[in-house]
Design a protein with these regions (language model features):
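C-terminal accessory domains and tails appended to enzymatic cores
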Residues: 4, 13, 17-24, 45-47, ...
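N-terminal ordered "arm"
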Residues: 6-49, 56
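A near-ubiquitous, low-amplitude feature marking generic local secondary-structure context
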Residues: 9, 66-67, 150-153
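Generic marker of "main functional regions" within proteins
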Residues: 18, 27-31, 36, 61-62, ...
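A basic- and aromatic-enriched beta-loop-alpha substructure that forms the phosphate/nucleotide-
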Residues: 49-135
């Protein structure tokens, strides 16, 4: 999207997560004001006005991103999805943002069908609503215009920037993990198990463990992996953790080891000063309780 935008236009009335986030992304990329009203024919025909979630048209060449005109049996999709697709980020967003597909379902199918698709009771949808969602959406809906420098616009820019940065950086992060990690097979008295070890680098990433679970998914090893080992960003040693709450690892079993300075009481994470891979494997072996 290299077009110079004059402004972003979305529907008046109640705001929803999809149009809010779509506006956040475009505000972060273009730094322009956001208007909340019905579009004119001239605005729909203008490639310098982004029309979000209103207008009855999906015309990326004119920056029109509405989905309400799609047939009832169309795959669940929302205005945020259409914007991300136009930016070439949709596939990565669907891979990296677990919340995106439920958001598409909620906007296109409503809470009842979304609950059935998720396999939960209808009331669970309401139980997951955050006061942050309520406040941001209400404040966004309250005003007909939001300009750079104003509180809500600046918050939206930050949200959009964080989302874009996360999507764009995670792809690079997965490549980094592929270059600097090793897959371990650890032998223990209860049998063998798999762990992913991320080597320490200089400089160290700000969140060393970020993306490791996604990397395991990408390798197709989700059903095989048991533990993760990664550099401790607060010290010179390593963190050890269960892979997605795998019940085979209980790190309270290594809490009394002399080189372990922290083990969570629930056993899902521990920190050690050890750096020798052989010792790290031994700590995992001691923590393993079986499949």
């Amino acid at each position: 999207m290299n077009t110079q935008l004059d402004y972003i236009l979305t529907h008046p009335g109640g705001a929803h997560k999809d149009d809010f986030l779509a506006c956040c992304v475009l505000a972060a990329k273009h730094g322009v004001r956001i208007l909340r009203r019905d579009p004119s024919e001239g605005e729909l025909a203008s490639p310098s006005v982004a029309v979000i979630d209103i207008g009855g048209r999906h015309e990326p060449e004119f920056l029109n991103f509405d989905h309400h005109q799609f047939p009832r049996d169309h795959e669940p999709i929302c205005s945020l999805s259409l914007v991300l697709r136009h930016l070439g980020l949709y596939e990565d967003a669907r891979s990296f943002c677990d919340w995106l597909e439920p958001a598409e379902w909620f906007d296109a199918r409503g809470p009842g069908e979304t609950a059935r698709w998720l396999g939960v009771e209808r009331k669970v949808i309401n139980q997951m609503v955050s006061p942050m969602d309520i406040s941001l959406l209400r404040r966004f809906a309250d005003e007909p215009e939001h300009r750079p420098g104003e509180l809500i616009w600046e918050m939206m820019r930050l949200i959009g920037d964080d989302l874009l940065t996360f999507i764009q950086n995670l792809r690079d992060r997965l490549d980094f993990i592929g270059t600097h990690s090793e897959r371990w097979t650890v032998e223990g008295p209860q049998g063998s198990f798999e762990a992913l070890f991320l080597k320490r680098t200089d400089p160290l990433p700000g969140e060393p463990s970020m993306g490791m679970e996604r990397y395991v998914e990408r390798l197709g090893l989700d059903g095989e992996m048991t533990a993760l080992v990664y550099p401790d960003r607060r010290g010179s040693g390593y963190g050890l953790s269960r892979y997605r709450d795998h019940a085979g690892i209980d790190l309270t079993r290594v809490a009394d080891e002399s080189d372990v300075h922290f083990a969570h009481a629930r056993g899902f994470v521990a920190k050690t000063t050890a750096t020798d891979p052989a010792r790290l494997r031994e700590l995992l072996r001691l923590a393993f309780v079986g499949h």
